[in-house]
């Protein structure tokens, strides 16, 4: 076997399908189409400035964020790779304000695809790791154009969640609800090869990731948690922690899947009109599915994230995930949250980070 005895993505999907005698193979075909889009995006990312794809596209998305040239290209690659096969009924993308209606010449399938075509694209010009995130749900009305409300399904109904990471090597990490598995792209064969089966997140960790520049907007429970971590071995936790921040959800997730940790992008008061920063349907939900299937925990900070009922296709949400002990601790701090601002036992009202006067 040219892959050194390791399964390819195609072989893996066939084996998974054999566990379900009634399966038609359409889900496998859709995942294969998604994986092709990820290969194409990986190639564009790898060529970077040589391909003339860096910089701004001169437009903004529905979130009000500046679109990078690669955002637009990656979105097109996802649409073109998946719209034609008759496996998907409709799609939602971070880069499109409304759900995507398939061209009339293409058959409608059984599934809904939701994706962020290029997560972390603000990093692309400085050559920091980026990725793509996707979620697949069953269409409530298969074989026809979906209604807007059909996309508003909780994460518990997902049949597949995954991401591709474009780093020193390109990897595809996915779950079908039976463990989380990572495939590495063999650039010579052009095949995804199963390199990390059944990933497991350690229950304990000494590493956390949060954007500390938002500390003045944090809720008391988050301030308490971060203060205790940064107080280290002399504080109430009695151990030293390391803090990370990459500003790429895919990169943060990958690190946690590979070696543990906890990630926080919590709800805060920076923009009272937003319940969080990350998008529920095509960022937080698929990542939560992967994390739970790897033995970790994913939460809004207060409850299991996969149980949240979406209200809008671009809904934002607070997101905490990773090693179970730390996520459970953060949820407990929110349950114990006092009605008055938290006073750090070490640093007073300001916490470890001094607030601007």
From Swiss-Prot:
A GO MF term: magnesium ion binding
Self-association and partners: Homotetramer.
Species of the source: Methylibium petroleiphilum (strain ATCC BAA-1232 / LMG 22953 / PM1)
Coiled-coil region list: none
Cofactor(s) needed for function: Mg(2+)
A GO biological process held by the record: fructose metabolic process
Reactions this protein catalyses: beta-D-fructose 1,6-bisphosphate + H2O = beta-D-fructose 6-phosphate + phosphate
InterPro entries (UniProt xref): FBPase_C_dom, FBPase_class-1, FBPase_N, FBPtase, Fructose_bisphosphatase_AS
EC number: 3.1.3.11
Binding, substrate: 119-122, 211
Stated name of the protein: Fructose-1,6-bisphosphatase class 1 3
A GO cellular component annotation in the UniProt record: cytosol
